[in-house]
Amino acid sequence: MAGKTLYDKLWDSHVVKQRDDGSALIYIDRQLLHEVTSPQAFEGLRLAGRKPWRVDANLATPDHNVPTTERSAGVQGIEDPISRIQVQTLDENCEEFGIVEFKMLDKRQGIVHVIGPEQGATLPGMTIVCGDSHTSTHGAFAALAHGIGTSEVEHVLATQCLVQKKMKNLLIKVNGQLARGVTAKDVILAIIGEIGTAGGTGYAMEFAGEAIESLSMEGRMTICNMAIEAGARAGLVAVDDKTIEYVKGRPYSPKGELWDKAVAAWRDLKSDSDAVFDKVVELNGADIEPQVTWGTSPEMVAGVSGSVPDPEKAEDATAKEGISRALKYMGLQAGAAITDIKLDRVFIGSCTNSRIEDLREAAAVVKGRKVAANVKQALVVPGSGLVKEQAEQEGLDKIFIEAGLEWREPGCSMCLAMNADKLGQGEHCASTSNRNFEGRQGFGGRTHLVSPAMAAAAAVFGHFVDVRELI
């Protein structure tokens, strides 16, 4: 009998009941909550007269709608009335149902997918859900993590279980070592460029290989964060010493004898050597260069030394139409060099790239330089209050401010047009976020997905440059 994949092990250990239709009732260990997808779920509990099944399995924080500028006025200072109501409602719901919340003025507040690992609320072997598609981030810890809808948020609150269908297994193996200046963001963009945004549909995607093993936990979180952009609902990386070292000593992590037992169990959270995957894709890490998206889908990506594609050379009519539409929206010419794309704004942040290592990489590039005259605004938005605090202790805030970038409060910010940080129509933005869809960062905004180092370089040069030449 063949061995088990990591996904098989996680799935099998959480099945409560197998159903006749092929689906299964799965136990959920942790639910993360934010202000956008939880209000109706709490209202559903209230209308049904139910209480959360396990209050301590939930952790909440506002992130999507919070302002990243001055917060001294608290929730009442949020200008947009809908955003203010959503944040207020989360506060009220968590208070009513007894759920721990890191409120807007709590220094532990931040983006859900940053604070979960930061607090040790994300642990290896867990099933983790959140009403947010980028919940796949937590798979970096060998946790089975994926986004859910609002009705499912209510179901988990009420029962701590979900009905799910088992996915197939996909192995993405990135062999060899990455070149200097090539980051986890470049790796995942290159993967998506290779397999497309539907390449992982129906699969749990495990990332392995020498290049993945060499990444820090923060880098692995970036990789798993964007598994959803490759069509996979969940991304996974096996447990190793880096995983255990990262989790150790965090507030929600096990302590004492429980820690020793947990580590012993976590060591098995890897695919068996004889495990069989439904599909395997291999890439050579040494071939990956810094990546830049040129279109309106994460799969529309090129190396920084490349150029914007010509729709006339597309492989079929559908691809030709897609490229043509993207170029029209993005205001780009076929054949233009990636390094000729000029930027109006720069955004360094989001659940993909707002952790301390991301900020260090960006600061190293802008240190001693100034934001280019054609760049109207360059934002740096830490992923949590604790990341912000650490960055300030290291003096990173001063480096950014001296270079002309804005240092903000934690939140989702310009990743999505749900708060005050937005692009204007026709503006090009170098963004460390995860989605470059039409209007994602603001009506008519043009998003180019890049790594923190590439975004920082774009801020000071005013156009894309190969960051490998700067470090």
Curated annotation (Swiss-Prot):
Name of the molecule in the record: 3-isopropylmalate dehydratase large subunit
Reported cofactor(s): [4Fe-4S] cluster
Keyword terms: 4Fe-4S, Amino-acid biosynthesis, Branched-chain amino acid biosynthesis, Iron, Iron-sulfur, Leucine biosynthesis, Lyase, Metal-binding
Subunit composition and interactions: Heterodimer of LeuC and LeuD.
Species this protein is from: Hahella chejuensis (strain KCTC 2396)
Catalytic reaction(s) noted: (2R,3S)-3-isopropylmalate = (2S)-2-isopropylmalate
NCBIfam families associated with the record: leuC, PRK05478.1, PRK12466.1
Annotated EC: 4.2.1.33
Pathways involved: Amino-acid biosynthesis; L-leucine biosynthesis; L-leucine from 3-methyl-2-oxobutanoate: step 2/4
BP terms from Gene Ontology: L-leucine biosynthetic process
